[in-house]
Amino acid sequence: MKKLIAVAVLSACGSLAHANTNIPNYNTDAHLYEFTQTYDLVVPKGSQGQTNLWVPLPFNGEYQQVKSIHFEGNYMNAYVTENNKYGAKTLFATWNKDAQKRDLKVMMVIETKDREPMVKGALENYTPPKDIQYSVDVQEYLKATPHIKTDGIVKEFPDKILGKETNPLKKAELIHHWFVKNMERDNSVLGCGDGDVEKILTTGVLKGKCTDINSVFVALARAAGIPAREIFGIRLGAAEKMGKYSKGAFGSANEQGIANVSGGQHCRAEFYLAGFGWVPVDSADVAKMRLAEKKSVEDKDTQAVAKYLFGNWEANWVGFNHARDFDLYPQPELAPINNFGYPYAEVGGDPLNSFDPKEFKYDYVSKKL
């Protein structure tokens, strides 16, 4: 059994899109989780050859820190890399074509902090600088990608929603509340959705899961001149604050704080305000709560959740990366990939079904410490 212990191997989130480091820290309650991932990869019928596995790992930042990481398995080789456009941290493991089993276990201890700038009143009197100039790393999140278009029908939506509003914070809030009123969750969608914004808006089927809804938020914000990005990650347990509105929509765990989170992948979003930094938002979870609890848009619980999730996040969740429409490293047969919120694997170039833990054969368990 090969083992590799790596403590503090996950450095800060690279150079991409840093917020203003001179502002106060508005992260509040801290949480500590033990997060264990177990893989026993199943070779698809008819596939043969070398097996390659790419696992997304959490980044370190002001609101989340990987305190330790340890991985072991019967792999031929395994290492951590950030060698991709977005610096998305990746554990890459490979098994030779004659391997009888393909085992990997990853154990992490992660500290997260609730992000609550809006709760703390940090944006109450926000006024944008007269001359807004974004750094090169922030400008990256104004650009279009194949799934995040910013012209054509995508540009038409914020033009209609925002009218003559010029304050970026108020523009983002108008976009968020448009989602609350107009987009719904569709549990039949595979995984977290593919987040094809142009397709969603062109068809007029304003439904989907978290990647669909929050990708539309990101695209509309970018089209309105506001830097924005998704963050692909996973829920780690129960939501102590938001749980009063729904026991299941925002994450759950047993009485011992243990949760099977194999299906807990969740995409969030954030937008950038000049002179302040990145602001959290999660329009998709408003739709998820509405569906789970059968609430109307006008219901007081819906409105309370919508208010909290603009400018705040509860940290029973950890983020992996902001990567979209990019190439993993080493490059797989499928390139580029849409996003990197799930593990990805190929056997002889044939992809495994990342969205089905039983078919792919992975098991994720989180425990609150």
Swiss-Prot record:
**InterPro entries the UniProt entry points to:** Papain-like_cys_pep_sf, Transglutaminase-like
Identify the domain of life: Bacteria
- Give a yes or no for keyword Signal in this entry: yes
User: Which SUPFAM superfamilies does the UniProt entry name for this protein?
Assistant: Cysteine proteinases
Q: Which UniProt keywords apply?
A: Signal
Entries under Gene3D superfamilies matching the protein: 3.10.620.30
Name the Pfam families on file.
Transglut_core
Q: Where is the signal peptide?
A: 1-19
Q: What is this protein called?
A: Uncharacterized protein HI_1048
